[in-house]
């Protein structure tokens, strides 16, 4: 890894972490459901799908921009550990329906958004 890539990852990571902090702070929970985490994971999934769609469809995305958005911004914006903790907390509180909804929503929505981003990159 060269220095330019490292700086791109660091800058993207800083912006992604700040975005996650503010988005999750605005929408932390809605009636015990962790909306903020679902939203940040969804945004990051769409962006990653779009970037890798561009690459797949033959559009050159410079390595430093891939590092900035992919590893840096999206890596810091999305959060599997918080999703896991929030799901565990719902289970601990015996909110079984909300825990199942959280798991289902995160998997279905984020995978769908990767697909949508991938397809939109073709246009």
From Swiss-Prot:
GO terms for cellular component: plasma membrane. Keywords: Cell membrane, Ion channel, Ion transport, Membrane, Metal-binding, Sodium, Transmembrane, Transmembrane helix, Transport. InterPro entries: FluC. Its main location: membrane. It catalyses: fluoride(in) = fluoride(out). It is found in: Cell membrane. It is a multi-pass membrane protein. Na(+) binds at residues 75, 78. The keyword Mitochondrion does not apply. Pfam families: CRCB. One of its GO terms (biological process) is cellular detoxification of fluoride. The chain crosses the membrane at residues 7-27, 39-59, 68-88, 100-120. Fluoride-specific ion channel. Important for reducing fluoride concentration in the cell, thus reducing its toxicity. Belongs to the fluoride channel Fluc/FEX (TC 1.A.43) family. HAMAP family: FluC. This is Fluoride-specific ion channel FluC. It comes from Thermococcus onnurineus (strain NA1).
